């Protein structure tokens, strides 16, 4: 059983298993397996990267695996896979990450940079400040380095992934931006701050608490929901995941499916609202949708298209964002 886990969506899967704790990995065997099976299973692995370069890189990673250690070897392998140019093909190195080496650093990327929006209570003075450097490296350099760990399809993907990777002290140490179990942060105004890992399960988090939240933000953690705004004659569909009870039952766990909302029932409700209320605009919001099963969305959209043909006065708007990915992108094109 292979210990190298590959997350391969949309192509035939490769047998794999997690390495618990990162010990006992036979990197030579796993990398040989990767080098032979990934090209065989992928529809066109070398569309953007030369096969000879790939094989040479595999050899170099094998040669350094013993000295580099499991985590660094996994990252080197993922950096190679990212260069292949397929964002649905990746090595899931998270299983080798130490959860006790996560910085309490929630970041939001806005137009002028990365801002701290969440941290531990003892670091709350960081809140609202823009991050400008880590150690001696400008934040742009840190972003460039972290971006080698995933395939960059577009700028939106970078803005989505970087805030997720940034809090990992292990990653910052791998790239040489942090040392001695802590990160030296520089904030706007040239303020410096030493940040150490914090227990992710511990209470006492500090975060911005706005007075009110827009509908799409307040409901961002549900699979899908809707709201009719009668004064504006707007029907708002918030589609956060291409998933639901039916998809779970078909592709994963029938037992878990019972606890999930039914997209079929949601669709019936949606068209009941459309047919029973004056609607001038439909907003179909997929800004938080990272994918799943595109088929359910396609069927809904096709039915919606037929409805709109009969009601040409209704304007439809589709909202996407940096987290829109995979099946959600397909549904956007639908």
Label the model's feature ranges:
Residues 8-9, 36, 217, 291:
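A ubiquitous, low-specificity "background" feature that marks scattered single residues
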Residues 19-282, 306, 312:
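Flexible, low-complexity junctional segments that flank or bridge functional domains
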Residues 129, 281-283, 287-334:
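Conserved acidic, small-residue-rich alpha-beta core segments centered on
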Residues 14-15, 98, 297:
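Hydrophobic alpha-helical membrane context
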Residues 1-21, 34:
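Bacterial Sec-dependent N-terminal signal peptides
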Residues 11-12, 241-243, 288, 323:
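Short, glycine/serine-rich, charged loops/turns that create anion-binding
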Residues 11, 139, 302-303:
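Amphipathic, positively biased hydrophobic alpha-helical segments used for protein targeting
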